Amino acid sequence: MLSNAQRALIKATVPLLETGGEALITHFYRTMLGEYPEVRPLFNQAHQASGDQPRALANGVLMYARHIDQLQELGPLVAKVVNKHVSLQVLPEHYPIVGTCLLRAIREVLGEQIATDEVLEAWGAAYQQLADLLIEAEESVYAASAQADGGWRGVRRFRVARKQAESEEITSFYLEPVDGQPLLAFQPGQYIGLRLDIDGEEVRRNYSLSAASNGREYRISVKREAGGRVSNYLHDRVAEGDELDLFPPAGDFVLRDSDKPLVLITAGVGITPALAMLQEALPQARPIRFIHCARHGGVHAFRDWIEDVSAQHEQVEHFFCYSEPRAGDSADAEGLLSREKLADWLPQERDLDAYFLGPRPFMAQVKRHLADLGVPSQQCHYEFFGPAAALDA
């Protein structure tokens, strides 16, 4: 347990983290990924190169230091970290590596005059406190997944039963367990962890489950990203009949029980978890609005399916917006999703539940629009594909 003196030292470093936290964490990652190859599969190198991952962790460390006396306020952040760790199979033996590299980075970046032995001892104790909390929470999730019907721990082998192009950029993979045993149920909005060997190097990635749980198979729908190592591998080199290693479903961005109108607002590949949410919500009586934005019809995945669902369920309405329509495209609006368009498409009653996913600028825009249109902030839910970040309201 941290002493009062150690808490005071942690809080005293907050101004340094506010101005130099990102540089410190960048140095931390450079050290850890360079010297400990066993943890490299846990990290997406594209997120390292873009700075998104160091930025996200720097913000997390800062939040931890600011709330060192009120850790209960970090509950939502801890839940996201736990789910992300579980999806990639972060294990107790990984934590000492992180702690060693973090303390080295603090000393090497801040210097010995600031990062004294007392400061390092305080941060060492603070890190161990956080590590113990995460290890315990993650173990409870691992155990629950293993004990549930159809559940498992670690990796499970799946076969690609079907591979289907959904648009010019997105392809779906239908995955069935090789052992033929029942399959763990998941909540709409969750994702699975995928472990691959690409040219002799292990990599791990998360992909949203794009169809509701059915006990037989999982479906992921993957966008081919320019320069994306894993997405291009899946598109080009994984075929029907191939086998893949999966970790159990995880994630805290899930459809919540409610009888309020449901609004799903997506852009691009952000549509994938919303598809599972839509399927799950269909038996309910509440009105559903499905709003999807794409550049044009060629990259608009699942359009036919959405239209069929709307035709068969009177409580469902859909609206499509194309920012760069091609000749012959048909959409309800063109250009970016404006506040005026969104106002027309939302239910008149603003006491609704909104879930939105897509590129970060899109989500920031949607969040502002929903606030301007009177949708309560606590009823607006969103998720990042990749490291979490703040959305300016």
From Swiss-Prot:
Its cofactor is heme b; FAD. It is an enzyme of class 1 (oxidoreductase). It catalyses: 2 nitric oxide + NADPH + 2 O2 = 2 nitrate + NADP(+) + H(+); 2 nitric oxide + NADH + 2 O2 = 2 nitrate + NAD(+) + H(+). Its EC number is 1.14.12.17. Pfam families: FAD_binding_6, Globin, NAD_binding_1. Residues 153-256 form the FAD-binding FR-type domain. Belongs to the globin family. Two-domain flavohemoproteins subfamily. Is involved in NO detoxification in an aerobic process, termed nitric oxide dioxygenase (NOD) reaction that utilizes O(2) and NAD(P)H to convert NO to nitrate, which protects the bacterium from various noxious nitrogen compounds. Therefore, plays a central role in the inducible response to nitrosative stress. This is Flavohemoprotein. The lineage of its organism: Bacteria, Pseudomonadati, Pseudomonadota, Gammaproteobacteria, Pseudomonadales. The gene is hmp.
